[in-house]
Regions:
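A beta-strand edge to alpha-helix "cap/lid" segment located at domain peripheries
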Residues: 2, 48-125
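A short, structure-level motif marking secondary-structure boundaries and short turns
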Residues: 3-4, 35
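Short acidic-aromatic low-complexity motifs
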Residues: 4-25
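Short, flexible active-site loop motifs that bind/organize anionic cofactors or intermediates
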Residues: 9-12, 36, 107
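A solvent-exposed, acidic/Ser-Thr-rich amphipathic alpha-helical stretch
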Residues: 19-71
Length: 125
């Protein structure tokens, strides 16, 4: 698979099958960072971070608006749609930067507005 296909397959697995299934696209030494927060490492770090987020937001539905690749790097502009338990659904604009090695994501950084996230989830900053 091309790097773009790996990222697309990862996002689709997260949408359709959930966190556990999506981890098959994460490299053992992956570094994942939601840029307002410290990085985590490996599939277990990705798993723990996503599950922690989804406790607050409910499951995600990723809508990729635009995507480009340069070599092993894939950049996408997304709306991550959330439906918090007991709250109102909200879209979160996200810019994602991925590096793919073989058929696995080795680096993943997401950039988003923490204030928008807090407003959507009802969390205070």
């Amino acid at each position: 698979m091309s790097p773009q296909q790996v990222v697309n397959a990862f996002c689709q697995a997260l949408n359709d099958e959930g966190v556990e299934a999506s981890l098959r696209y994460i490299a053992d030494d992956c570094v994942y960072q939601n840029m307002p927060f410290p990085p985590v490492h490996g599939p277990q770090g990705v798993r723990d971070t996503l599950l922690g987020f989804f406790e607050i937001t409910g499951p995600v539905r990723i809508e990729t608006l635009h995507q480009a690749a340069a070599g092993d790097y894939v950049f996408n502009e997304r709306l991550d749609h959330f439906a918090p338990p007991g709250g109102r659904p909200f879209p979160l604009p996200v810019a994602g930067a991925f590096q793919v090695r073989g058929d696995k994501i080795s680096t993943w950084r997401d950039y988003f507005c923490l204030r928008q996230f807090a407003a959507g989830t009802g969390l205070s900053l």
